[in-house]
Amino acid sequence: DSKILNEKRTLNIYLPQTYDKTKSYPVIYILDGSMNEDFLHLVGLQQFFNMQFKIPDFIIVGIANVDRKRDFTFHTDLKDLQKDYPTTGHSDKFIRFLGEELQPFIDKNYKTDKTKYIIGQSLGGLLATEVLLNKPNLFTHYFIISPSLWWDDESLLNKANALLSAQKDDERFVYVSVGKNEHKTMVKDADSLFQILKNSGKKKLKLEYNLMQDDNHATVLHRSVYEGFLKLYPSSD
């Protein structure tokens, strides 16, 4: 039951097979985390990586969607977007839900450490970017995949430099990825986000950019996450 969102939300939670209450675990938060969305795929990837590479055991929290167009977009005055997305513009509430309700709930009920990942694609990538620019301390690791930065005439990209310059230089990992076969605007905007982050002068910001050569918007997520983990945990040697 979320007081901020004023509705019940379903969480899908995966605990590692070796879950031990005397240890603490990093947490991955998945924005499109319904059973029929990305949750099972990403749990499977994590189990595969556990067998093949030196990757930590993660707790994985899939946030099942109710209305992603409402939750993952900020307000826009553009009439055509308001028409196509009638419930739009409540990402501020959803971000408050993440920081004030969801994370404290997970930290209270499970053995978590300070490492928190967020994985978002498309509108979820837009939301992850908004969190990175406005509430960066909510997560330590950002997987921003094919973000819908075209939203509101790219207004978030246009504000990014100013928002970044107001931030402290904290340890953070940001992975931006997009499929080469996606719409040209998606590719251009993802590249722009990476360039803005790269030129932000943040010494402790670890950045990776991946233009997925063979992927489109429908196929990009799984391979992107796989490659992102490879960049973080290269080999079991």
Predicted segments — roles?
Residues 1-237:
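Non-catalytic cap/lid and distal C-terminal segments of serine-dependent acyl enzymes
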